[in-house]
Design a protein with these regions (language model features):
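Face-selective signature of the C-terminal outer-membrane beta-barrel domain
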Residues: 283-312, 342-456
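Transmembrane beta-strands of outer-membrane beta-barrel proteins
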Residues: 141-145, 171-173, 211-215, 302-306, ...
Length: 456
């Protein structure tokens, strides 16, 4: 039995925007200590190949400590692509966010970084990409436990248990729990990021270790209102620095309005509805994956990976702002109690994104080392279905911690009388609302020849 606590960290002055760096390949000591056994199962070729590469670093995004850093290189790619067992962790992060379904947690055996050229050949995406591999298990029992906390009250629990069943079966089970209240209190919820992800898997060893086939299940459930809460007013000094606005401390004060709901016009139904701030950031998905490989006697290595993922809720909220100005009572802005307001205000914009996502992905490759040439032929068949719409509205708020929403005279275009009435929201769906329902299919064949000209 080998139970090992992998990581324990207590941050005394941590912010949610702190970036971390992972040095790769990961778990190097553990992998070296178990190389003999891996060879007997023929499961080691991926880690061996990665050890031969120069080390590459994967840095987490400075704006989000739960996903890789987005690196813009001036070529068409929507964001950083993350692959899990040779397939996209999420097909597109524009609706179903990567951090809602994938974390660099204890369920992973290791990670690697693909260059734009490698990613372009294998996937068609021209971008730096993170390639991750699941922990499948080994003959002996192993446990990995990571725990992180900070003085704001964040706690993160990350556990993996794996081992063997009999001679030819392996198992793995993982649990990821994140309780992050953020660096300031959100009055409408307890956590800026409440994410839970579970993994379960069984692996069958084939033909005395020449191959394996694994069935993996994943469930993710994430609520991340911190995605729209990370905003703050400031004064731009003109030299690249900012100055604080009196009474507001960026990063420590909340710029999310104090009341818990808004009226908006639903793009899909055409009706006025109420958005409660506790809703709108929910994501949950179920995924089942089949990953396999087999080493033939003639030297050819065949890999076949496939998965189906269904996310019936893939929602998020965007906030935007504009310039800050000062108004007087004569400008007609009122607080919720009907009193006239004078002082600083900012025009705010809000987008509500509601989506349902599903995809079926398959990738197969066959490769062989021929002298100083490594040949590989691959096939991708990726299907993606999206049912998505967004609604937008505008509002004006005070410039202070927990802003108050201000009402003003507004003519609702849906009002047949076209009478001006006092309203806290306006400009319904004037800011790029969208409705999309459809599917996309990608079929690709690729061939590579990695020619090592000299032994060095």
């Amino acid at each position: 039995m080998n139970l090992k606590i992998r990581t324990f960290s207590m941050a005394l002055a941590a912010m949610s925007a702190t970036s971390y760096m992972y040095a790769l390949p990961s778990n190097n000591i553990e992998e070296k200590s178990s190389t003999k056994e891996k060879k007997s199962l023929n499961l080691e070729e991926e880690s061996v190949e990665k050890n031969k590469k120069e080390e590459r670093n994967v840095m987490l995004n400075a704006a989000d400590a739960n996903k890789p850093r987005e690196i813009q290189i001036g070529l068409p790619s929507e964001d950083v692509t993350v692959y899990e067992n040779g397939l996209p962790a999420v097909y597109s992060s524009s609706v179903h966010k990567l951090s809602a379904h994938w974390r660099g947690d204890a369920s992973l055996k290791g990670t690697d970084l693909m260059t734009p050229s490698e990613s372009a050949i294998a996937t068609g995406n021209i971008a730096y990409a993170v390639s991750s591999f699941s922990e499948l298990g080994q003959k002996e029992f192993k446990g990995k436990l990571n725990y992180k906390a900070n003085h704001f009250g964040m706690q993160n629990f990350d556990l993996n248990l794996s081992g063997g069943i009999g001679t030819n079966w392996l198992y793995t089970a993982s649990m990821y729990q994140n309780f992050d209240p953020g660096s300031f209190k959100l009055r409408f919820t307890d956590y800026a990021d409440r994410t839970q992800i579970y993994h379960f898997g069984l692996t069958r060893i084939l033909n005395e270790g020449k191959g394996r086939i694994s069935l993996l299940y994943k469930y993710s459930n994430s609520k991340n209102p911190g995605n729209f809460a990370n905003a703050a007013p400031f004064i731009y000094a003109g030299d690249g620095s900012i100055k604080k606005i009196a009474g507001f401390d960026p990063g420590m004060n909340s710029y999310v309005q104090r009341q818990g709901s808004f009226q908006y016009l639903n793009t899909k139904t055409g009706k006025m509805e109420t958005w409660n701030m506790t809703d709108g950031s929910e994501n949950h998905a179920n995924e089942i994956a089949l990953i396999s490989q087999y080493q033939f006697d003639n030297g050819w290595l065949w890999k076949f990976n496939a998965k189906y993922m269904n996310a019936p809720r893939a929602n998020y909220v965007d906030y935007g702002g504009s310039s800050i100005s000062e108004v007087s009572e004569a400008d007609g802005y009122q607080l919720s109690d009907g009193s006239a307001y004078s002082g600083l205000i900012e025009g705010r914009r809000t987008w509500l994104h509601i989506g349902k996502v599903s995809n079926a992905l398959m990738t197969t490759e066959i490769s062989k080392q021929l002298n100083n040439h490594k040949l590989m032929i691959g096939l991708n068949e990726w299907y993606y279905h999206l049912d998505y719409y967004s609604s937008s509205f505008q509002w004006a708020g005070t410039v202070e911690p927990y802003p108050r929403t201000l009402s003003q005279m507004y003519v609702n275009p849906l009002d047949p009388t076209q009478t001006a009435r006092r309203s806290e929201t306006f400009g319904y769906n004037e800011l790029s609302p969208e409705y999309t329902k459809g599917s996309e299919n990608k079929l690709a064949v690729y061939f590579t020849d990695e020619w090592k000209v000299t032994p060095k």
